[in-house]
Amino acid sequence: MSKYEENYKVTTCYKFKLKPTVIIQTEVKEWVHGNWDRVRTRQHENLKENATKGLLSKKAIQKLKGSINWLVASSQNKNLKSLKTNYIHKFKINFITLTIPPQENEIIEEKKFKLILNTWLTYQRKFSSLNNYVWKIEKHKDNRLHIHILTDTFIHHRLVRNSWNLILKRNGLLEYHNKKFNNYDPNSTDIHSIQKVKKVAAYMVKYMTKNNEVDNLYNGRVWSCSSKISSVMQQVLVVSPDKINEVLKPLMNKKIDYKEILTEPDQFGNSFLVAECYLLKLQDWILLKGSYLYEIFKELIIFLRSSKQLSIDFNLKLA
């Protein structure tokens, strides 16, 4: 290409990231005569650092919040009957805390801690049909690690405690407790049912990130979620320029708030559009009923609630 030939960008497609409380739209542009853009973004710099160093970045906090929002949006009310009293209990979400009791001389390292956690999750997937969940690691004041787990699956409090203590015992982590109290049944778990979930995502993110630093010894992921939630969060709707008006039309509703995400001003004071956000409450999705966006959201919720596989086309092009 001649150095005098004009180079410019054209829009190739639009991408939509669907979340229960926001729809994020970005415009994808490419240079007509090749990419002259040499600017390193902050995101690219962050990708160089693989270890989390026991901390949650701003981006990780947003992902944690997103995973909790999907868990809340897809969870259904369940009726549980007590075998002792025949009383019907309402259930929607469980908040579980798993703790490792004090050790005499041992500090639990990352590798062993991961093994214990994964063993418990595998056990519950097999015997309790553990479905959707989000977990986050935190540190006690005495440097002991514990795990918070949010799940839409009911697990009896005694099964939670018995299974966790069994795994701890098999890994030699109850010997000090037995030496002091002559038993292998410490109060190492806590479980609460959350029925009022209107603001649970915001509350749980605040609660689960209040102690952001875990430990210099722990360089692994400090949070994660079930594979189905992870899969849903990775889905992106790709829309061709010819279809963009059709997709955007249902979002032009006064009840749906709109917000632009801009870059920080450059040396000339100019900011550039990065993304457009359409802010919703969960009940606002009914306003989009009949639209392609609504059908995708409904499909994602059904996927999280059942064993059904995703079958919807995420590439919307001109027919």
Where are these predicted regions, by residue range?
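Calcium-binding loop positions in Ca2+-binding modules
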Residues: H146
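Right-hand nucleic-acid polymerase module
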Residues: M1-N143, F154-A319
